[in-house]
Structure formats: structure tokens, C-alpha cells
Swiss-Prot record:
The keyword Transport applies. Residues 1-12 have a biased composition (Basic and acidic residues). It comes from Aspergillus versicolor. The lineage of its organism: Eukaryota, Fungi, Dikarya, Ascomycota, Pezizomycotina. It is a multi-pass membrane protein. Belongs to the major facilitator superfamily. TCR/Tet family. Keywords: Glycoprotein, Membrane, Transmembrane, Transmembrane helix, Transport. This is MFS-type transporter avaJ. Signal peptide: none annotated. Glycans are attached at N63, N265, N497, N512.
Length: 517
């Protein structure tokens, strides 16, 4: 609740005569303070560069791991690394060893990430978002060094050392923690009604990793014809990001503490919570448990849906490539064009459609005068309807792929499912409005924990289903994904919201019919 002092200050004129020779009120000082104010425009370019770099390493990482396994395990007498890689291309034993290695790396990184991510985000409420973003880059940087050492000295550095890179990646939180820390940064500096649009830009940057990353990697490999140059470039970018996060990015939490008094609230928290140990992962989940039953149900549905969506997105891309290669014999060029086209469409929806739609809803709300005197709710105007509409689009997209067994069906179904890209930022925005401002880091840390768990379970389950059915019904996986999305769509109908504003009036069956508050 706003204090009387704040109310008086807000009624003062914006422009007043300077009372003294205060530098902060001079033209230069005021401009510099405004320039260094925390803003999404500071964060988004850095996060986008981070995400695209991670995406551009997908192909080089695959080839480097495959080449090292082939050279060290199956062609130890062959001194030519590239020639050994070409000879092992169709070796089923090499493919089996590669698959087993990826399982070890994924489980190791996922478990360590599940431990480190929530605690790092919990610490961010005390030490700020910048240090966490900085830590999230250290793991990939160390992994780059290990891979470079293995590529330069393939006979001396065993491929098992790459697992140390996976471990460092997990301990630093990597892209998962960088994403949640970026979302916390946005939450610190934005009003609740503006978060969907801001989170959409974060999601668009994350999607750009899959859209632009493989294209960049393919271009680098075609120009340099070597994996080493690609990793040296990634090393340079990660090193530059450390400098940018340290020196250029303004801290968001300090500004929030000064303006909203969160620093005082933090000191009043129970001492036991403030002294929670690093490995007490479950303590972070307390940010997900509201007191009343209705809010608790809402948060469970939203959090589980968001975590499942993340797990599916992490495991779906390689299976889409495998399905298209098996069914339609698509090769690298066709697969790259397919992934780029689908992800660019998702980016367009995120950066153009969602902000325009949400701004239109807010303008209509202000024009009708409905925002005055209304309590803040977890689901703003249009948000609950957006969640249900996106889930419906994903159901339709996956079912289209499962039913229409043709290249056109895969493309159309993927574009339809890609139209549901606003689902993740909308869910995250709603989650941040369910807890106090001083608990944002703890909340997003718990979300990071769920992400790490779903990153292990769902891709493993999807690979098992596809491997078990590819010989008879290769489209069964997409039918299962459509069924799962349908379950979450039904669950979203049980979400309650004490709001007088309807969601997306054009779709009355998707509207929120809860009673007026």
C-alpha cells in the first residue's frame, strides 16, 4: 500500500526549480542517470547474444563429440581427425556410444542444474541479478576451454573430459538460469501489466537460438571447415558477455529496493530462511506455495504447465529432425530451412502479435475506466484467454502432424503449434504476479528447478516413445504430445481469477467465467 509520503510526492509537479547546485539535477547528470537506468534495452541484446551463441554450438558440439568418440574409440591409429569423423558417419556402434555419452552428459548437467539453479536465483534476491547472469556464463566458458583443448590435442585429452564441461554447465545454471535471471530482471523494472510483452521478447530471444544458431554454425563450418574456429568464436563471445554483464549492465534489484522498500522487507524475513544452506533446494519451492487454496491450485497448474512446456521444447527439435529424415528423407539443408522457418514464425508472433494484442487490451481497459479501483490479479486482461488459446493451438498443431503424414502436414502442424509460442512468457508473467516482489528470485529459482527436472525426464521419455514406435507408428509421439497438451488445456479451465474483465471476448468458450470480486 502506498504511504502518504509517496502519495504527496506523486502529486508534486514533474519539473521544479533546482534548490541548489546539485549535480544530479543538472542537464548532464540527469541525462546520465536516465541513461544508466535499468531497462530491458540493456538486457535484451546481451541475452540474445548469449542465446544465439548457445544455439550456434548445437551442430559443432555434436560433430566434436562424434569425432572424438570416433577418433579415440574406433580409429585410434588414424591421425586425421576429420577423416576419422567421415569414416565413422555410418557406424552403428559409434552412434550407440554417442547416444550413451549424451545420456550421461544430460543427466549430469540436469541434476547439477536442478541443485544450483534454484539456489542461485534465491541468492539473486540478496546479491542482485547481475552476479547470477555473470555466473551463468562461466560454465559455458569453461566448457569451451575443455572442448578446445580436446580438439587441439585429441590424442591427449580424452572425450570423457567433456563431461566436466557438462558438469560446469549445470553448476552455473547455463541458459536456464540466464533465462530465469533475465525474467527476474524484467520483473524488477516493469509493472505487472507490462510483463507479458517484456517476457515475450525474452522468449523470442530464446527461440532465436534455434532459428539463427544452426544457420550461423553452418556458415562458420562452410567458411572455415573446422570446428576449432567455431569454438574460439564462442569462447570470445562468452568472455565478452562476462565483461558486458560486469561493467555495462545496470543492476535492477538496487533500483527496485530503493523505490519499493524491498530491502526493508528482506531484512524482516525469518532468520532461518535467510540462512538457508546452498544445497537446501526444497527451500526455494516455498515461493510456489500461497496460503489460500484457490491461489495454490492456480499456481500448481501454471507452474507444472510451464515446466512441461519447457521440457518438451528441449527434446522436440532433434525428434522433429529424426522424424522428417525417416519419413521424407530430408537432409541438412531442408531440415535447417524447416527449423529456421518455424522458429522465425514463432519469433514474429512473440515480438509483433503479442505486444500489439496486449497494448490493445490495456487501451480498451483504460478507455472503459475499468482499471480504476480494481485489485491486482494474477491473470490480467486477456492473459487467461491467451493461455487457453495457445494450448488449443498446440493441440491442433501436434494432431495435424500425427494425422497428415506428408511434408505439408509437418510444416503446417509445426506452424500452428509455433503460433502458441506466447504460452511460455504468459505463464511466467502470471507466476511472477502470484508472489510478493521480494520473493521473485525465489519463485523463479523454483521454476528453474522444475525446468532442470523436466529437461531430464521429458526428453528421455519422448526419445523412448519415438524409439519404441518409429518402426510401426512414427507419428505416435506427436499424437501423444497433442493428448498431453489437451490435458493441460482442460486443467486451465479450472484456473480461477477474481477479475471483472473478460479474456478474449471473440472466443467465449475460452473466457474466464469466474464471479466478480
Amino acid at each position: 500500500m502506498t504511504s502518504p509520503e509517496h502519495s504527496e510526492d506523486e502529486r508534486q509537479p514533474l519539473l521544479t526549480k533546482p534548490s541548489g547546485p546539485d549535480e544530479s539535477q543538472s542537464g548532464f547528470g540527469s541525462s546520465w542517470i536516465q541513461f544508466r537506468k535499468p531497462s530491458a534495452m540493456w538486457l535484451l541484446p546481451m541475452y540474445t547474444l548469449y542465446a544465439i551463441t548457445a544455439g550456434s554450438l548445437i551442430i559443432p558440439e555434436f560433430n566434436a563429440t562424434l569425432g572424438l568418440i570416433c577418433h579415440q574409440r574406433h580409429s585410434p591409429d588414424n591421425s586425421d581427425f576429420q577423416l576419422a569423423l567421415e569414416r565413422c558417419d555410418g557406424n552403428t556402434q559409434v552412434q550407440s556410444d554417442l547416444s550413451q555419452f549424451y545420456i550421461y552428459g544430460t543427466v549430469l548437467s540436469g541434476i547439477l542444474g536442478a541443485i544450483a539453479g534454484p539456489n542461485l536465483m534465491g541468492f539473486s534476491d540478496k546479491i542482485g541479478r547481475k552476479p547470477i547472469l555473470l555466473i551463468s556464463v562461466l560454465g559455458p566458458l569453461i566448457a569451451d576451454i575443455i572442448v578446445l583443448a580436446a580438439l587441439h590435442y585429441p590424442d591427449e585429452v580424452d572425450v570423457k573430459w567433456l563431461l566436466v564441461g557438462y558438469a560446469m554447465d549445470g553448476l552455473s545454471g547455463s541458459i536456464i538460469t540466464a533465462t530465469t535471471a533475465s525474467q527476474a530482471y524484467i520483473s524488477d523494472i516493469s509493472a505487472p501489466e507490462d510483463r507479458v510483452s517484456s517476457f515475450s521478447y525474452i522468449q523470442a530471444a530464446f527461440t532465436s537460438a534455434f532459428a539463427l544458431g544452426p544457420l550461423i554454425a553452418g556458415g562458420l563450418l562452410s567458411v572455415f571447415d573446422s570446428l576449432i574456429q567455431a569454438y574460439w568464436l564462442a569462447f570470445t563471445i562468452h568472455l565478452s558477455l562476462i565483461v558486458l554483464f560486469t561493467l555495462a549492465l545496470p543492476e535492477s534489484l538496487k533500483s527496485t529496493a530503493e523505490s519499493r522498500g524491498t530491502e526493508e522487507n528482506t531484512t524482516n524475513q525469518p532468520k532461518a530462511e535467510a540462512e538457508a544452506g546452498f544445497f537446501e533446494v526444497i527451500s526455494s519451492a516455498r515461493g510456489l506455495i500461497p496460503s489460500d487454496r484457490s491461489s495454490k491450485t492456480n499456481m500448481y497448474i501454471v507452474a507444472v504447465t510451464e515446466a512441461a512446456l519447457f521440457g518438451v521444447s528441449m527434446g522436440l527439435v532433434p525428434l522433429q529432425l529424426a522424424y522428417s529424415a525417416y519419413m521424407f528423407h530430408w537432409r541438412s539443408s531442408a531440415q535447417s530451412a524447416f527449423l529456421t522457418g518455424v522458429n522465425l514464425w514463432s519469433i514474429l508472433v512473440l515480438v509483433a502479435v503479442v505486444p500489439l494484442f496486449m497494448s490493445r487490451i490495456q487501451r480498451r481497459q483504460q478507455a472503459e475506466g475499468q482499471s480504476e479501483g480494481q485489485p491486482q490479479t494474477a491473470f490480467g486482461p486477456g492473459e487467461l484467454g491467451t493461455i487457453r488459446t495457445c494450448l488449443l493451438l498446440q493441440v491442433a498443431g501436434y494432431i495435424t502432424i500425427a494425422v497428415v503424414h506428408s511434408p505439408l502436414g509437418v510444416i503446417a502442424g509445426s506452424l500452428i503449434a509455433g503460433s502458441g509460442a506466447p504460452l511460455s512468457p504468459t505463464l511466467t508473467s502470471c507466476l511472477t504476479k502470484m508472489v510478493p516482489e521480494e520473493r521473485q528470485g525465489v519463485l523463479l529459482g523454483a521454476v528453474s528447478f522444475l525446468h532442470a527436472i523436466s529437461r531430464i525426464l521429458l526428453p528421455s521419455g519422448m526419445n523412448y516413445v519415438y524409439g519404441s514406435t518409429v518402426g510401426t507408428q512414427p507419428y505416435a509421439l506427436f499424437a501423444l504430445l497433442g493428448f498431453g497438451s489437451g490435458i493441460f488445456l482442460v486443467a486451465s479451465m479450472f484456473i480461477g481469477n477474481k477479475s471483472t474483465l473478460p479474456d478474449i471476448p471473440r472466443f467465449p468458450y475460452l473466457m474466464n467465467y469466474s464471479s466478480r470480486s
